[in-house]
Regions:
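Beta-strand-rich recognition domains
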Residues: 1-48, 61-146
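A short acidic/small-residue loop/turn micro-motif
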Residues: 49-57
Length: 147
């Protein structure tokens, strides 16, 4: 499926959230992604998709999205690193590629910038097997804890 992309992850422990971003002229291209545990994709700031569909431990589904007039692709990946009712305990990763007419325009490990999402606090208490961790967002020194 992937010709050039390399699966990446920052091993910072449990409950890690990373952002991958690529800029360029991606008009008419196809975006492919496989990730664990969950991802959200944005094209030029507009929500494009969420995934992946569930798969057995050790397997990952590759999703494809068509990009129209697009110049920026941003992927937000949540890696919980624990078992729950919707995930298995496995290594988190993100592997993505943007291809147009057989030419690879961007691939993880080469063209995507990666950073940790510091808007979410990482070290929080797990709640239960149903809900992973509670989310604690950091916004201008005000702590918002959704229930």
């Amino acid at each position: 499926m992937f010709q050039k992309a390399i699966p990446l992850w920052h091993d910072a422990g449990l409950n890690t959230h990373l952002i991958f971003r690529a800029d360029g002229d991606f008009s008419g291209a196809v975006f492919r992604i496989a990730a664990a545990d969950f991802y959200k994709v944005y094209a030029d700031g507009a929500f494009l998709g969420f995934g992946p569909a569930r798969a057995a431990k050790g397997y990952a589904r590759v999703d494809e999205y068509s990009l129209a007039a697009c110049h920026e692709v941003r992927i937000e990946v949540a890696g919980y690193g624990c078992s729950s009712l919707s995930t298995v305990r496995q290594q988190s990763f993100c592997c993505a590629e943007i291809v147009r007419d057989g030419e690879i325009l961007a691939a993880t490990g080469f063209d995507f910038a990666c950073m940790r999402n510091h808007q979410r606090r990482q070290k929080v208490v797990p709640i239960s097997i149903c809900t992973f961790y509670y989310f604690e967002f950091i916004t201008n020194k005000i702590r918002i804890i959704p229930t």
